[in-house]
UniProtKB/Swiss-Prot annotation:
Additional facts recorded: A D-omwaprin has been synthesized to permit cristallization by using a racemic mixture containing equal amounts of L- and D-omwaprin. This D-omwaprin provokes B.megaterium lysis (after 45 minutes of treatment), but fails to inhibit growth of B.anthracis.
Name of the protein in its database record: Omwaprin-a
Domain WAP: 3-47
Pfam annotation, one family: WAP
Location(s), subcellular: Secreted
Tissue: Expressed by the venom gland.
SUPFAM superfamilies linked: Elafin-like
Any one of the GO CC terms: extracellular region
GO biological process per UniProt: defense response to bacterium; venom-mediated disruption of cell wall in another organism
Length: 50
């Protein structure tokens, strides 16, 4: 049902208009993740902590 998510975390929220670019990590190219920022979802390069 739910596919495993790509590794890494979403970076801080960018200051852009509200847009739905993606539905889930699989709809983003390469290693990018589908990051939810309230009124928008966009593909972003992940950040790694630790």
């Amino acid at each position: 049902k739910d596919r495993p998510k790509k590794p890494g975390l979403c970076p801080p929220r960018p200051q852009k208009p509200c847009v739905k670019e993606c539905k889930n990590d699989d709809s983003c190219p390469g290693q990018q993740k589908c990051c939810n920022y309230g009124c928008k979802d966009e593909c972003r390069d992940p950040i790694f902590v630790g």
